[in-house]
Amino acid sequence: MTSRPSSPLTPRLPLKSLTLAVGLSLGVTLPPASAAEVAAENTPHRYTIGAGPLHQVLAQFAVAAGVPLSFDPALLGNRQSPGLDGNYSVQQGFQQLLQGSGFDLVSSGGSGYTLAPHVEANGALELGATNINGQSAQDAEVYAGGQVARSARLGMLGTQSVKDVPFSVTSFTAQTIRDQQAQTVGDVLLNDASVRQSAGFGNFSQVFMIRGLPLNGDDISYNGLYGVLPRQIIATEALERVELFKGPNAFVNGVTPSGSGIGGGVNLQPKRAEDTPTRSVTLDAGGSGRTGGHIDLGQRFGEDNRFGARVNLLQREGDTGIDDEDQRSTLATLGLDYRGERLRLSADFGYQKQVINQGRPVVYLGAGLSKVPHAPSARDNYAQDWSYSQLEDTFGMARAEYDFSDNWTGYVAGGAKYTRENGVYSSLTLTDLAGNGRGGMLYSPHDEENKSLMAGLNGHLQTGPVSHQLNFGLAGMWGEQRSAYETIATSARYFNNLYDVVPRPRPVATSFGSDIHDPRIVGKNQIKSTAVADTLGFLDDRVLLTLGVRRQSIVVDGWNTVTGARNASYEESVTTPVYGLVIKPWEHVTFYANRIEGLAKGPTPPTSAVNRDATFAPVRSKQVEAGVRLDMDTYGASLGVYRIEQPSSYTGSDNVFRVDGEQINKGVELNLYGEPLDGLRLLGGATVMKTELDGTLNGSNDGNRAVGVPSFQLNLGADWDIPGIEGAVLSARMLRTGGQYVNAGNTLSLPTWNRFDLGSRYRFKLDEKAITLRANLENVANTAYWASANGGYLTQGTPRTLKVSATVDF
């Protein structure tokens, strides 16, 4: 990609001679090469250099080649290199090592050379020395347009180039978050055609359907660590990356805390202080008067900018686009880091609070309905004014990495969180097509404490012509859940209508579980795993074979909320393998395939289910996937096919949660991202899914489609720079989702729905300050539709919502 320097270029010199000097310390260079060395630089020689940090690999190669290079290693940040193995001339070797880094070799004005970002001028490649700032380094790590990153953190495998792994991975950047004014992780994930958003069991949590299978907010990792993030809704203001891993990922990341994530996982990367100070203030407004402010401050300190601090503060409150719904969001985070020559440390601390008053709930369907009632008006709210949800989380984690040598790096990380939730919920269960139904009441405080640890060792070695990337990992999480509830009997439920809601007084509770003011322990879980993997490289790493195995153990104890009696206790362990293959036959084309298995904690019934205290045994899943990627430097695309098998679970019309039979999801996915034409950025894709139930009770539902899985999903998104108006951009996006069934018997279904979004932004300077104005309009047509039937209940799509903001970067 093209990266523009932040300071004027020195006179440009074509890249001809590579008589270079190596000196990784600032101001330190080695003597220039002799004439004999210069003459020999184009002669290929055999080099075997292990993988490691790019600046170290460059130094080793230059010393081995007998040529000097002078540059500041901080310019390359934490970029990694797979090393070099084979016959190369000096020029070929440096080109191979710097490929995709965003940097090239340039003359420093004498006989020496340095590094500079890739610059394209008049169609010919000419390079000039420049000072590199933090933004330039970031630009080299993303596709043109800045929406999607080239690498992602893959748990025990560490940070990997997306094109070199046998899995389907997409990493969305902070720029995408800002430009789309995405306020939650769900807003970001909607950019991928394999993902749709549902709602939790009446408490306004976000549930993500990835490849037709749910991922709960509990099961999103933070910098590779599970169990330390807010469990229901996650704000985006402190995030640098939202990384989506499609398919079972227990091998890579370990077992998820709540047992979801078979269809895919999400890892969030926190913001870090950049070499250039960050001073950003954003004011925003949206919905029906909801306003907010966000402050983002970052600074590096000390020798070589080794110490960094990043602070993000957010407050947003007011009415949403749904009638009478009010939401307040508070976020405060602090990220600290240290980057030494061999030691890297980081610590992240956060506090988040979400309060939703009279939030629009999900809708249940009673027995006897012949079809699904149509969705109410997009802005209609069928919640009672006494319903609310309050979600409060305090969380933190620390991580350390140390390079024992150029080829071996160890890491250890630990974190914890405390969650306090309160809420009074009320959802309608419809009994006829006219929208009549009965509403309940559930008051359910919930406390949760988690502690999480992980450690590992990543290394590289060579055995003859075969390279090895070795990974050893340990992971563990310890959780404790406390809950209580007050509710009413079925006979005491109030009558109401979905299309003509009548305010009702809050019913008096008639059924109780535990002490509302001091909830008792209802669950404890221990999740531990050990994993080892080896990625073998053949033919100069043009063929990569990943072999791995993970030993997973789950210990779960459960207690009845009413009596306190133990009602579940089990311990189960399983060893699951992973096989992955990457073939790179041509420069821009990669083929990949994988077979991966996983073990997950048994599904948890919703609090609204009759058997809310039931505990289910762990479930085992497996996936087979194959695909091809196209990487054209400025843009990329991928096409893949997959098959996932896992036990099926759902809530029936009798309000009983069941695990029944096996669900098989088969799909074809297409993804497109980057900037194929100058000034035009694309972010979209399509997926077609076929699901099937097998082995159900008495075979009653065998061959039916699984609940809540659309037949297809289509995303078309584009960003366009307006010609003649520098800094002005228009954007548009279409979301189209195919029909899906609401019940396992396939007698009730939802129709296909469409949503159209528009956006614009304008960036300019005023008094040397960068100002960005943004406006995004979601659901332009204000279409009313049922967005999801996941779990056997209905989630309505958001109404037309206008978001505007102004950001000042000092």
Language model segments and positions:
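Acidic, small-polar-rich N-terminal luminal/periplasmic segments of exported/outer-membrane proteins
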Residues: V63, P68, G83-D85, G128-T276, ...
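Surface-exposed extracellular loop regions of Gram-negative outer-membrane beta-barrel proteins
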Residues: V355-L369, W478-R482, V578, V582-E625, ...
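Acidic/polar loop-and-plug regions of large Gram-negative outer-membrane beta-barrel proteins
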Residues: R316-T320, T333-D403, A416-E448, A492-P519, ...
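Gram-negative outer-membrane beta-barrel transporters
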Residues: L539-D540, G636, R643-E645, V659-A744, ...
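Structural signature of Gram-negative outer-membrane beta-barrels, strongest in the C-terminal barrel
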Residues: D337, E448, S467-N471, A475-G479, ...
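Membrane-embedded beta-barrel scaffold of Gram-negative outer-membrane proteins
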Residues: R399-G415, T419-Y425, Y592, A617-E675, ...
